[in-house]
């Protein structure tokens, strides 16, 4: 299916609030919101750490992550600041390690306590969508048979509480659902109208095509030619099997090839290599990365999807150690990148 560039001009654009400034030390939220608005984005993804940090400046102390009264106060104030700048709060993120805990486990009790609290935050922030990332809890701690039921139950709570939606994302370091096929299979089985996919260029290409633990930066479980063919077939399958209405958004970022290959082992916090890569090595497309970002975006567009393109980057520079970022210039660059990406999706080459 050929893409018509004219049909892409109405795609709405969002920028993740956590994605301006060094990942290790982001600047205050309000200047970031202003930079995002000045770059003509129309919405943000509201990141939970930004609620905590803005809450600290608002309240004079950092809110406890489970003090939902204070968190809702901060979220409501963020909504007010977004309203002043004509920014919608498109989604609250990232809700993690929710699904698959055994019955009566402390993990399950914690997950549901957080879920109820985050629903309150959604209401305060004025958003109708919650991003749920596929859990990276170690498999030996999970009951995989509960995954679908847990997400179905959460979807029903979201629907009852406010007509809210659940966008399920494959995190490429997830212990049980690292690929788009995995989350799509789960979403189909959940079978709720308010549950769809959060697809992501990094999570797809970074999981199926790239690998931060190899010298080449690519997966080496097959030969180079077979890798390209396998990835091409995966994207063709994505384009031909996922209904456009089940894609709630596409998140966009590239990745730097890491200076030296990561260990294949999890770090001291339990985070897997691709999770570490994700945290600090994700620039905008056309800015030093090497993933086939446009190939993924093109496949998503071929489903007929024309919804949110949301730029979620964690740009610590090629060495992951960047300390200073001109956030106004960076947001403007992201706006330019959006046009280049759409052009490449249609023509095979980015615009100048």
Description of each model-found segment:
Residues 321-350:
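C-terminal helical cap(s) of enzyme catalytic domains, especially alpha/beta-barrels
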Residues 2-10, 31-40, 66-91, 114-126, ...:
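Acidic (Asp/Glu)-rich catalytic clusters
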Residues 6-11, 26, 43-44, 153-290:
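Acidic/histidine-rich catalytic cores of soluble enzymes
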Residues 2-3, 81-85, 89-94, 98-199, ...:
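Active-site acidic/histidine proton-transfer and metal-coordination neighborhood
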Residues 45-82, 134-139:
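Glycine-rich, proline-tolerant flexible connector loops at the mouths of alpha/beta enzymes
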Residues 16-21, 47-51, 94-97, 135-137, ...:
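Active-site beta-loop-alpha junctions enriched in small/polar residues
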Residues 29, 71, 75, 108-115, ...:
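Aromatic/hydrophobic pocket-lining residues that form the small-molecule binding cavity
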Residues 20-23, 310-329:
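A short, acidic, flexible beta-alpha connecting loop/helix-capping segment that sits on the rim
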């Amino acid at each position: 299916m050929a893409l018509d560039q004219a049909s892409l001009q109405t795609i709405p654009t969002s920028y993740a609030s956590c994605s301006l400034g060094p990942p290790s030390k982001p600047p205050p939220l309000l200047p970031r919101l202003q930079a995002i608005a000045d770059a003509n984005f129309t919405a943000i993804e509201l990141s939970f750490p930004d609620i905590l940090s803005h809450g600290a400046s608002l309240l004079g102390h950092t809110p406890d992550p489970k003090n939902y009264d204070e968190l809702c106060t901060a979220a409501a104030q963020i909504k007010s600041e977004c309203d002043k700048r004509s920014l919608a709060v498109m989604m609250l993120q990232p809700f993690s390690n929710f699904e698959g805990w055994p019955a009566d486990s402390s993990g399950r009790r914690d997950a549901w306590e957080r879920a109820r609290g985050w629903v309150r935050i959604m209401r305060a922030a004025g958003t109708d969508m919650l991003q749920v990332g596929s859990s990276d809890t170690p498999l030996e701690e999970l009951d995989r048979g509960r995954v679908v039921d847990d997400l179905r139950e959460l979807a029903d709570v979201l629907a009852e509480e406010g007509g809210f939606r659940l966008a399920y994302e494959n995190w490429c370091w997830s212990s049980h659902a690292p690929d788009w096929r995995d989350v799509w299979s789960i979403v189909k089985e959940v079978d709720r109208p308010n549950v769809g996919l959060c697809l992501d260029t990094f999570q797809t290409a970074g999981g199926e095509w790239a690998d931060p633990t190899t010298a080449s930066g690519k997966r080496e479980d097959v030969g180079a030619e077979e890798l390209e063919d396998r990835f091409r077939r995966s994207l063709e399958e994505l384009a031909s099997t996922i209904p456009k209405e089940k894609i709630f958004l596409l998140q966009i970022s590239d990745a730097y090839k890491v200076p030296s290959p990561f260990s294949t082992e999890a770090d001291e916090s339990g985070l897997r290599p691709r999770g570490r890569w994700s945290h600090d090595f994700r620039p905008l497309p056309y800015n030093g990365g090497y993933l086939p970002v446009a190939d993924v975006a093109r496949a998503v567009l071929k489903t007929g999807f024309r919804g949110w393109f949301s730029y979620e980057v964690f740009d610590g520079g090629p060495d992951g150690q960047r300390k200073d970022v001109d956030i106004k210039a960076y947001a403007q660059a992201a706006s330019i990148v959006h046009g280049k990406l759409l052009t490449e999706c249609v023509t095979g080459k980015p615009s100048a």
